[in-house]
A protein has these predicted regions:
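An amphipathic, aromatic/His-enriched active-site/gating alpha helix that lines ligand/cofactor pockets
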Residues: 28-40, 59-93
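N-terminal first-folded block
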Residues: 3-44
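Short, well-ordered beta-strand segments in beta-rich or mixed alpha/beta enzyme
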Residues: 6-13, 43-70
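Glycine-rich beta-strand-turn "strand-cap" elements at beta-sheet edges
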Residues: 1-6, 44-52, 80-105
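Intrinsically disordered, low-complexity acidic/polar segments
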Residues: 19-21, 53, 65, 101
């Protein structure tokens, strides 16, 4: 078992009238993020019953890859664009991988 991967769950509450705009801006960021070195996955998920509840699942090879992501232009653009679309500040949880083994991602 390896604990090298960093998995980040970001919980976002989006204003009801801004969901489509938020998802469009987030897809631009997600597409660019998936091309970054050290990024294993970047998923955008929406609650089935609450369309304003969005969860980002970000998987990085290590802390350095996650830190590098925060310095990219597309991340800065996303942050600026979506800040007024959020009903509350986003919440993130940093997790370590237990199973499956990192090599299986």
């Amino acid at each position: 078992m390896s604990n090298g991967l960093l998995i980040v769950h970001v919980d976002v509450s989006v204003l009801p009238d801004r969901v489509d705009d938020f998802l469009a801006a987030t897809e631009i960021n997600a597409s660019a993020t998936r091309l970054e070195p050290g990024v294993v996955r970047f998923d955008v998920l929406r609650d089935r019953d609450d369309t304003g509840h969005v969860v980002l699942v970000e998987v990085y090879r290590d802390d350095e890859a996650a830190a590098a992501h925060k310095t990219t232009g597309h991340y800065a653009d996303w942050r600026g664009a979506v800040a007024p679309m959020m009903a509350r500040p986003r919440r993130s949880t940093r997790l370590v991988n237990i199973s499956p083994d990192d090599a299986e991602w």
